[in-house]
Amino acid sequence: MNLHPTAIVEHGAQLGREVSIGAYAYVGANVVLGDGCRVLHHATIEGHTTLGEGCEVFPYAVLGTPPQDVKFRGERTTLEIGANNIFREMVTVHPGTGNGGGVTRIGDRNLLLIGAHVAHDCQIGSRCIIANYVQFAGHVHVEDFVNMGGHSAVHHFVTIGKHAFVGGMTRVAADVPPFLVIVAARGTRSEVRMVNGVGLERNGYGREDIAALKSAYMALYSRRARQNGIPIRDRIQTLLNTRPLNPQVEYLCEFLMRSFAHGRNGRYLESLRQDPVHRKSWKLEEKAEVPVQVVGHGKVHQSRVDGNDGSRDLFRLTARAEPGWAFAGWNGNPGDPPEADSIVVDPTRQMIATFKPL
């Protein structure tokens, strides 16, 4: 581990092997950094934030600070980041909110360039390139292999399909179809321009798939298709009824049908937002739990148990050490006998679980 003397790592933060933390960086008490993560000087990681192995956080990037949502009331929410992601200078990523599911997720091997912003409750896939100053509003879903051009801005609840390419300075207010390129048009509009052939070739798609997608694009978006008076939903359904149907074209058509037939303002997730059943499923339920601070490398599992008189809930805490570590005790007291790694406590207590290297 390489920890600069001016860096601040709060008590309770969990750091993997060969983690590097630069000068004046800050790592909060509830942060988990996987093996080989590099936090460069003046970077900040706060909140209940987890980074997978091999991530890099560049100067002045800020991850895990409270979401910019007036409905947020300080509830415990999380930011979950996969492996081998790069967050360049001044990138900001916020955790989820209680009304939006409680978690913001980012997959693996994404590149977020200078000044990009990922708002609360976003779900970002893997292997995406998010260029300088791209702005994702809350609840945006981005599938895998998406390429976002610089200064593009994405409206709340938009879904961006896999292998899509969004041109620079594009205003994205509706779902973006997979495999296609959209660019800024006149005024504040954006429009579908072509199939992302170059991106598909780079990611291993064959000529047959690309040709089928180009044919589908012509049937859906060409000037002749738009001028023949047939509604876009009918054009999509005609393609879906074609047999045999290329799997990539089928994925494209099903994505479009969700947006046009079931979406609201061109955004499928917006329609779910209006559905009371889905809204309830998004809302984060408040769960009582014992506040536990972990020192060293290990985890504490909690389960609810009934009290002797049945008048209040108690919690069983079970300590599980990571390989190469051993549980040492609760609140600084050695765990002897070994059964003490599992105890029952009142939820009003604040516990410290200590793990020591073997």
Regions found by a protein language model. Name each.
Residues 291-306, 336:
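Short, solvent-exposed loop/edge segments of extracellular or virion-exposed proteins
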Residues 292, 298-300, 317, 327-330, ...:
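Extracellular/surface recognition and adhesion modules
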Residues 313-340:
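Surface-exposed interfaces of beta-sheet-rich extracellular modules
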Residues 286-293, 341-358:
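Conserved "repeat-terminator" motif of extracellular CCP/Sushi domains
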Residues 2-189:
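Structural signal for interior beta-strand "rungs" in well-ordered beta-sheet cores
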Residues 11, 311, 323, 345-347:
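Surface-exposed loops/turns
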Residues 1-6, 11-12, 17-18, 54, ...:
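Terminal amphipathic alpha-helical/low-complexity segments used for targeting or macromolecular assembly
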Residues 286-289, 310-316:
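Short coil/turn motif common to extracellular beta-sandwich-like domains
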